[in-house]
Amino acid sequence: EDFSGQAIMVSHSRDEIYRFAEEVIMLQEGKVIGQGETKEVFRQPKNRQAAILTGCKNIANAKKLGEHSIFIEDWGLELTMEREIPDKLSAIGYRAHDFVPLCSGEEENAVPVKLLSKAELPFEQNFYFQPEKGEGEICFLVQRDGPYGKMQEIPKALQLREEKLLLLTEEN
């Protein structure tokens, strides 16, 4: 409170950065890969490495199909969206707490999955799935006191909400 100047804080703790820094600059091998207001950079990182640094657990290769559609190659899923897709799209990011668990894979923008493993923790459950039509792993984290904390069944699909989808490019 008594200090009126600016300071540079170097940290490897994303929680510390989010809590204390109004603005952030992310570096990788001496190059800036993300910068701006901290909350905005965490909300919408622009590229794969920045998404990883902000804690995004689900990053998958993707390509633009049209002005409003993409194909998530790693998950075998085509999505149609209202927003325009950037030409240089290379991947998507999706935060592990943001999925909507479904009992069937028939819903729009849902990836059918099969359970690989599950971890019970004091305050959350961690689910690790494999997409039925793709490769890789999808992490879904459920807070015990959250909206899905009392889930009775293992989800058969995970729905992606457009407003939560991170469209990542290789450029900053």
Please place each PLM-identified region on the residue numbering.
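Conserved H-loop
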Residues: 4-10
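Two-component His->Asp phosphorelay active-site signatures
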Residues: 13
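A short, surface-exposed alpha-helical micro-motif characterized by mixed small hydrophobic
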Residues: 17-19
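Short, glycine/charged-rich "phosphate-handling" switch motifs in NTP-dependent
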Residues: 23, 35
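Conserved ABC ATPase "signature" C-loop
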Residues: 29-30
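Residues located in well-ordered beta-strands
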Residues: 37, 49, 63, 112-114
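Short acidic-hydrophobic catalytic motif
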Residues: 39-43, 51
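Non-catalytic connector elements of ABC transporters
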Residues: 57, 68-172
